[in-house]
Amino acid sequence: MAKDIKFSADARSAMVRGVDILADTVKVTLGPKGRNVVLEKSFGSPLITNDGVTIAKEIELEDHFENMGAKLVSEVASKTNDIAGDGTTTATVLTQAIVREGIKNVTAGANPIGIRRGIETAVATAVEALKANSVPVSNKEAIAQVAAVSSRSEKVGEYISEAMEKVGNDGVITIEESKGMETELDVVEGMQFDRGYLSQYMVTDNEKMVADLDNPYILITDKKISNIQEILPLLENILKTSRPLLIIADDVDGEALPTLVLNKIRGTFNVVAVKAPGFGDRRKAMLEDIAILTGGTVITEDLGLELKDATIEALGQASKVTVDKDSTVIVEGSGDAEAIANRVAVIKSQIESSTSDFDREKLQERLAKLSGGVAVIKVGAATETELKEMKLRIEDALNATRAAVEEGIVSGGGTAFVNVLSAVEALDLSGDEATGRNIVLRALEEPVRQIALNAGFEGSIVIDRLKNSEAGTGFNAATGEWVNMIDAGIIDPVKVTRSALQNAASVASLILTTEAVVANQPEPASPTPAMDPSMMGGMM
């Protein structure tokens, strides 16, 4: 395919147009009075959302060069979402601000490499200042505030706070659709471990790329399954019950894996295979935990058991199992309550007698998985469109809350960025590096400016007053009042703010240092052949 190439200013300006189109679409959602964006879907009703990364992923531009600029900003949003789970709109706004200011200076003759070094130094200083200003999150009220700010709903804040209290900060919290109109919290017994499906063809939901198994049997073994004949008698017996199967094994390879996948694709048998969690002796202990939780038996040579002799009675059972590419969640295992309690007691005694911090940490992880359970937030809404929007908001809020517990919180509403301006200004840089620092100084003001603009206020006036206010005081865009942001519950997780800034600076610097862009030439449209007059019959 022929390529289209642009150089220097032409290349950068085309990419900047794409950056602006995407950022201008996303940034209208920022702040408490941000608007929604409606996304057309190829099937079903349109999606109404204010989630930055969801909007960014949907944008495809006709011009190849502009589209590359837009895709780079979309990458910033996606990366921030992967790391912190929130802050994608802020990251997009920061990227646009750094690119705009940077392009002005590069066009005026500044060296982009020097600017990049200045940006990197300034961002590193800003991140350190953000961490220094952070306040740890420990109580239920603070957790609820973080979730409420992210979701724009105090009720959602209460649900997430309560869920984290019941299953622990590192506990498993999932979000499902409710059958009714009310959103509710449900805590059920369950276990999660960090192993995903061995083949993506095992998924049952192609959009979310997850496999949901209702009322499955669970085969638990520390053996490697390579020959399908070893488990064929067992599979035939399970097939008669019409129930799905989860296989937890050392590995599934050879002819066994493609055979299982083929039967899954044909619809003969709903089966998902995952590798056993942990390593060595710890793996054996975790498999035993799963067996006790689900009422099954570990098929292992230690007990003199062989796969070919396994029966349905040796299998574990659960109400539901959800498997994605990275993890498996077992909900409501059918294990005996007394056996589970005894296992928990054994692990607790091992924790008390352990002299290794590492071993103690791993034992506590096992204890949490065995006794903590899974919290399920069931989202209810009047319409499917509202339900989708609500689920996205709750997912963002949950991610933001976990980030806050991990690294602490700072003043929200963009105030935290303005509070670190003095630390960045104090950097002793010269030449193009000083220009890079000044670009970051201007970009750090942009989130507050945009939040104020979306709320109907003049951003420059808000910025000027904020710079002259004491640290911690900020502008509440929801009410138009000046308040102590943390006392008012307007807070952002440090992990979210720093991730947004770091990712924005990284991609913006790449755009500024771009000197050539290579794109595919659009294929010429094939002309429609003229109709043969003789085929027109009697049409007049």
UniProtKB/Swiss-Prot annotation:
<keyword id="KW-0067">ATP-binding</keyword>
<dbReference type="InterPro" id="IPR027410">
    <property type="entry name" value="TCP-1-like_intermed_sf"/>
</dbReference>
<feature type="binding site">
    <location>
        <begin position="29"/>
        <end position="32"/>
    </location>
    <ligand>
        <name>ATP</name>
    </ligand>
</feature>
<dbReference type="InterPro" id="IPR001844">
    <property type="entry name" value="Cpn60/GroEL"/>
</dbReference>
<dbReference type="InterPro" id="IPR027413">
    <property type="entry name" value="GROEL-like_equatorial_sf"/>
</dbReference>
<dbReference type="GO" id="GO:0005524">
    <property type="term" value="F:ATP binding"/>
</dbReference>
<keyword id="KW-0963">Cytoplasm</keyword>
<dbReference type="InterPro" id="IPR027409">
    <property type="entry name" value="GroEL-like_apical_dom_sf"/>
</dbReference>
<feature type="binding site">
    <location>
        <begin position="86"/>
        <end position="90"/>
    </location>
    <ligand>
        <name>ATP</name>
    </ligand>
</feature>
<comment type="similarity">
    <text>Belongs to the chaperonin (HSP60) family.</text>
</comment>
<keyword id="KW-0547">Nucleotide-binding</keyword>
<comment type="function">
    <text>Together with its co-chaperonin GroES, plays an essential role in assisting protein folding. The GroEL-GroES system forms a nano-cage that allows encapsulation of the non-native substrate proteins and provides a physical environment optimized to promote and accelerate protein folding.</text>
</comment>
<dbReference type="InterPro" id="IPR018370">
    <property type="entry name" value="Chaperonin_Cpn60_CS"/>
</dbReference>
<feature type="binding site">
    <location>
        <position position="413"/>
    </location>
    <ligand>
        <name>ATP</name>
    </ligand>
</feature>
<feature type="binding site">
    <location>
        <begin position="476"/>
        <end position="478"/>
    </location>
    <ligand>
        <name>ATP</name>
    </ligand>
</feature>
<comment type="subunit">
    <text>Forms a cylinder of 14 subunits composed of two heptameric rings stacked back-to-back. Interacts with the co-chaperonin GroES.</text>
</comment>
<protein>
    <recommendedName>
        <fullName>Chaperonin GroEL</fullName>
        <ecNumber>5.6.1.7</ecNumber>
    </recommendedName>
</protein>
<keyword id="KW-0143">Chaperone</keyword>
<dbReference type="GO" id="GO:0005737">
    <property type="term" value="C:cytoplasm"/>
</dbReference>
<dbReference type="Pfam" id="PF00118">
    <property type="entry name" value="Cpn60_TCP1"/>
</dbReference>
<dbReference type="GO" id="GO:0016853">
    <property type="term" value="F:isomerase activity"/>
</dbReference>
<dbReference type="GO" id="GO:0140662">
    <property type="term" value="F:ATP-dependent protein folding chaperone"/>
</dbReference>
<dbReference type="InterPro" id="IPR002423">
    <property type="entry name" value="Cpn60/GroEL/TCP-1"/>
</dbReference>
<keyword id="KW-0413">Isomerase</keyword>
<feature type="binding site">
    <location>
        <position position="492"/>
    </location>
    <ligand>
        <name>ATP</name>
    </ligand>
</feature>
<dbReference type="GO" id="GO:0051082">
    <property type="term" value="F:unfolded protein binding"/>
</dbReference>
<dbReference type="GO" id="GO:0042026">
    <property type="term" value="P:protein refolding"/>
</dbReference>
